[in-house]
Design a protein with these regions (language model features):
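Blade/loop signatures of beta-propeller domains
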Residues: 48-74
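Beta-strand-rich domains and repeat architectures in extracellular enzymes and scaffolds
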Residues: 82-101, 105-106
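Residue-level detector of Asp-centered blade-edge/turn motifs that repeat once per structural unit
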Residues: 96-97, 142-143, 194-195, 235-236, ...
């Protein structure tokens, strides 16, 4: 009985093995047939290259169209559109020697542009990579041989040295260590004093920190403005200022001894006159003028060339209505002749003396403008908002300088002075005519 059962089991196993073998052979034949059919279909498609190929091209074209179109913009004063970033540009800064423009974006790079290429067809730039992070703010050092950045994720300052190569370009080397993390709220701005003696950083929680160049905190300032919306160092290197929820701008002097050692931070003066919080402010190149833009719908121009230690207050020179919003930025041309204010995607340019609206630049960027600046010679206005940087001719500046020289000509009594002014007026008018006649970017 047991022998019969064993024989039956053996036969059953043998039958199963045969069935499995047949199934494997059958599957191999099916796979071979499928591969041959696929090869034939591919050959036919390659030979025909007809409807299928066209359909594929149409699908590719359709996928390209589905991508958001790049924002197009043109204007008679547009000198150039600097394109190189693959992410949105968040900050701009000109070097003090006027040769370079730095830009940072959320694409983990800082780009260095040559200002002499602004009017050229091609705009080359040098790229500094921000490892494992991206910079939201960038500022040149006074000697134009380094720049500092604020790291978005690291919440710290990182210094980059610019090392000049034999071909005239630069390589970039980050400092071995970042500054320590000290701020407890979002950063609104950073800056380096033109004297090279200190670095400033300011956050929304009313804190301003004064650092030495090695990353040690020299002083902490509480602005008592409920929130800080903006802060900056003055071009002269003596002052730091802030604005925020309160309707004033507060200015402090950072004091150093004769030997260069830090002494103290003292309150210098306030700009009082707005009826609502101040969005932003800017200095002229000599720090003798300041401009403020407020939620009250006005901008104000101030004479800040005062002896504040003798309790002399700044003089209000003018109040002008304007359109602004929480993200508005303001720039004052280095010569103090033109005020530029951003509002959303638009820019308005005013004559600083008369308050007249000279130019309205609408739809400059596809997103809210993040920064706006004049170059050190007051020839160009640059702004950022999306992936591009717009460069505009400062036509209002040319007009204002011509007007100023014409006023001087009326008062001139010396013949040599008159001839010199007449020549300068002709040159300025010729430059303006060239700008207005130039083809747009």
């Amino acid at each position: 009985m047991e022998v019969a059962a064993l024989v039956a089991l053996t036969l059953l196993l043998g039958a199963l093995v045969i069935l499995v073998a047949l199934a494997v052979v059958r599957r191999k034949e099916e796979i071979k047939e499928e591969s041959e059919q696929a090869a034939e279909s591919s050959a036919e498609a390659s030979a025909a290259k007809g409807p299928t190929s066209k359909k594929q091209k149409q699908e590719k074209q359709r996928s390209r169209k589905d991508k958001p179109a790049q924002h197009s913009f043109s204007h008679p004063l547009l000198a150039a559109s600097l394109k190189g970033h693959s992410g949105n540009v968040t900050c701009l800064d000109f070097s003090s020697n006027g040769k370079y423009l730095a830009s940072c974006a959320d694409d983990r790079t800082v780009r260095i542009w040559s200002t002499k290429d602004f009017l050229e067809r091609e705009h080359k730039c040098l790229r500094a990579n921000v490892e494992l992070d991206h910079a939201t703010l960038v500022r040149f050092s006074p000697d134009s041989r380094a720049f500092i950045t604020w790291l978005s994720n690291g919440d710290a300052i990182r210094i980059f040295k610019m090392i000049k190569k034999d071909d005239g370009t630069f390589s970039f080397k980050a400092a071995s260590e970042d500054f320590p993390q000290k701020h407890k709220a979002a950063i609104v701005n950073i800056g380096i004093a033109e004297t090279g003696k200190f670095i400033m950083s300011a956050s929304t929680d009313t804190t301003i920190l004064i650092w030495d160049l090695k990353g040690e905190v020299l002083a902490s300032i509480n602005t008592n403005q409920m929130t800080n919306s903006y802060a900056a160092t003055s071009p002269c290197g003596r002052f730091v200022a802030s604005c925020g929820f309160t309707p004033d701008v507060k200015v402090w002097e950072v004091c150093f001894g004769k030997g260069g050692e830090f002494r103290e931070v003292t309150r210098a003066f306030d700009l009082k006159g707005h009826s609502a919080g101040v969005h932003a402010f800017a200095f002229s190149n000599d720090s003798h003028r300041m401009v403020t833009v407020s939620k009250d719908g006005t901008w104000k121009l101030w004479n800040t060339n005062v002896e504040y230690k003798k309790q002399q207050d700044p003089y209000l020179l003018g109040t002008v209505p304007c359109s602004s919003s929480d993200g508005s930025r303001v720039a004052l041309s280095p010569d103090g002749r033109v005020v530029a204010i951003s509002d959303g995607c638009n820019v308005a340019m005013f004559d600083a003396t008369t308050g007249n609206l000279e130019e309205e630049l609408r739809g400059v960027h596809s997103e809210e403008i993040t920064d706006i600046r004049f170059d050190i010679n007051s020839r160009f206005l640059v702004c950022s908002g999306d992936k591009a940087i717009r460069v505009f001719h400062n036509a209002p500046g040319y007009r204002a300088s011509i007007r100023d020289m014409q006023d001087m000509l009326k008062k001139a009594q010396n013949e040599a002075m008159k001839q010199r002014l007449q020549q300068q007026i002709r040159e300025a008018q010729s430059a303006l005519d060239t700008v207005l006649a130039a083809p747009t970017e």
